[in-house]
Amino acid sequence: MNDLSGKTVIITGGARGLGAEAARQAVAAGARVVLADVLDEEGAATARELGDAARYQHLDVTIEEDWQRVVAYAREEFGSVDGLVNNAGISTGMFLETESVERFRKVVDINLTGVFIGMKTVIPAMKDAGGGSIVNISSAAGLMGLALTSSYGASKWGVRGLSKLAAVELGTDRIRVNSVHPGMTYTPMTAETGIRQGEGNYPNTPMGRVGNEPGEIAGAVVKLLSDTSSYVTGAELAVDGGWTTGPTVKYVMGQ
């Protein structure tokens, strides 16, 4: 059982989608959560939905002072910080040749630098708590070369590498660091890019479909936060319907 009783978890990008569902599952497992996002109305509403175990704080992940405030708030409200889910991010859909330098820098700043600042800021609090678990949300695009993801893919490869080096550095402090790599999953954000639910829509994926809901990803996140994963660090967990394992026979044969 993924028991998070007595643990406090900060979840970025917590207003909706995967972040909100991870918060729901964490609270159901006994955790107290601080949802952090720039979508203040949605974030506050999600926190209200979750009741007394949840709080909401505004957080721009690229601003170090915002991080310091959120971590201090979590400690003041709940006494400790035991978990961090670095989920906030933005996507892109452009070829390398046509993507602007400005856009590339923006995506990397949010998706990668934001993860770095978050880990850097939370480490002292986790050391004070006697350890903790950091789950960084990367992507299937951080496991393979994927067209039309120049800035996004670069940032998610960076998250994967940053997770591994942090796991090496922080292991003796009893702080575990792992990355989760979702495949195409239906969320409010991905729906805007044309992601469709239903069997058979993605024949190049062994399971033939996208993730139907964020809950299919959130379960892996909560598992890594819990003590049932106490000997798991530096791992990269693909939750992608087998997409990064390899193409299906029908896809290879052009059927």
From Swiss-Prot:
It is an enzyme of class 1 (oxidoreductase). Its EC number is 1.1.1.53. Keywords: Lipid metabolism, NAD, Oxidoreductase, Steroid metabolism. Homotetramer. It catalyses: androstan-3alpha,17beta-diol + NAD(+) = 17beta-hydroxyandrostanone + NADH + H(+). Belongs to the short-chain dehydrogenases/reductases (SDR) family. Substrate binds at residue 139. NAD(+) binds at residues 10-34. GO terms for molecular function: androstan-3-alpha,17-beta-diol dehydrogenase (NAD+) activity. This is 3-alpha-(or 20-beta)-hydroxysteroid dehydrogenase. It comes from the Bacteria. GO terms for biological process: C21-steroid hormone metabolic process. The active site is at residue 152. InterPro entries: NAD(P)-bd_dom_sf, Sc_DH/Rdtase_CS, SDR_fam. SMART domains: PKS_KR (SM00822). Pathway: Lipid metabolism; C21-steroid hormone metabolism.
